Amino acid sequence: MEEDVKKVKKPGIVSPFKRVFLKGEKGRDKKALEKSTERRALHTFSLSLPDHRIDPDILLNDYIEKEVKYLGQLTSVPGYLNPSSRTEVLQLIDNARKSHQLAGQLTSEQDAVVSLSAYNVKLVWRDGEDIILRVPIHDIAAVSYIRDDSLHLVVLKTAQEPGGSPCHSTEMSKSPTLSSLSESGAVLVEVCCLLVLAVDNKAAAEELCLLLSQVFQIVYTESTIDFLDRAIFDGATTPTRHLSIYSEDSSSKVDVKDVFEAEASTFSFQSSLEAGHSSSPSPTSAPASPQTKTASESELSTTAAELLQDYMTTLRTKLSSKEIQQFATLLHEYRNGASIHEFCINLRQLYGDSRKFLLLGLRPFIPEKDSQHFENFLETIGVKDGRGIITDSFGRYKRTTSSASDSTTNGNGAAGGSDEGTATSEGDEWDRMISDISNDIEALGSSMDQDGVPS
């Protein structure tokens, strides 16, 4: 009986501390509940599995939203950081958490919405819709997925905002192209930013990475065909100009490297889909562009360079001067609004039966939204693959990206390595690549000059 009396709670007797604590908990729960009920539905679309493909027109003319948690942004990160290195990235994140640069605990206060399009990545708070930041696509150098125990992190390596100063390093930079010496002799290393997001699980992380990979693919393809359009159209209309641009007094010559950098500035990114649990590269991975590039670099990828060089060489040997001019006009019209069907029909008439295989070489330069129609047209006219002797080099291009769980991919969809991935680049490789392409296009212009001289 006495025990029952002891168990009876006397009304009103609650410690002040407990009362405040309970009130705060109830208030937070009520506030969180109100927020969750008031939140709008995300602007999203159905994706085709297993690659989470989305209609390219949506990314070009609309956008798609995904829910994430925003942990923060790290600035003044050395540009040579390998974003697919689990160890390096987690070490930075751990240090940032200790110094309170990044959130230590995941709460509903960090809920955010990431909006993806072919033009930028926008991040807003889930509640209130206030913009956190907006990153243009050409400022994104890489994206990677890293798992840390129960945390699923998606990390974007982006360009440092204007005004950011290079960081000092006592060691030589891992990449000579990214460092310079100050007057005092100290090494100045180019810097970048890391945007750190968290998602619910591995599937959500892979989906976000694959969507960004598609964005990269769209921009890469658009930029590549635009570059081809300008190169051929300019060469066809003014063949003596080639790729060398002279001033009016012909006293100075613009470096061809600058021309290519200006044209290729929008597709110099790498998309590391997953760093996963291991930093070792996939056995099936091929060498790709080094991970030591900053987002501000403007380099034409090796794959794009090879494709351009191959096609320009083929056109030079298979088409006459007049036909090259007609091709340039058709390509220019297609880039300015003509339908893919009209473009294919006109090219078919230009090439004829004996040279219809030339259409295969255009495959890498057809935007994703028109690729299916283009493939159907090739099959209709009896051109089904690119394994012939002439078109061997055209088969290197792959539209499908590797599985996000076992490899990294660069911006053009080719498989790439991770931490120890070997890749040859730097200035010599760049100069050689540009020289090869410029020689081909210059040869194209020279052949047109010779064809145009009356005998």
UniProtKB/Swiss-Prot annotation:
Signal peptide positions are none
Q: Which PROSITE patterns match?
A: PID
Localization: Cytoplasm
Region described as Disordered: spans on this chain: 272-299, 399-432
Q: How does it assemble?
A: Part of a complex with MAP2K3, MAP3K3 and RAC1. Binds RAC1 directly and independently of its nucleotide-bound state. Interacts with HEG1 and KRIT1; KRIT1 greatly facilitates the interaction with HEG1.
| Domain free text | The C-terminal region constitutes an independently folded domain that has structural similarity with the USH1C (harmonin) N-terminus, despite very low sequence similarity.
Q: Which family does it belong to?
A: Belongs to the CCM2 family.
The name this protein carries in UniProt is Cerebral cavernous malformations protein 2 homolog
Originating species: Danio rerio (Zebrafish)
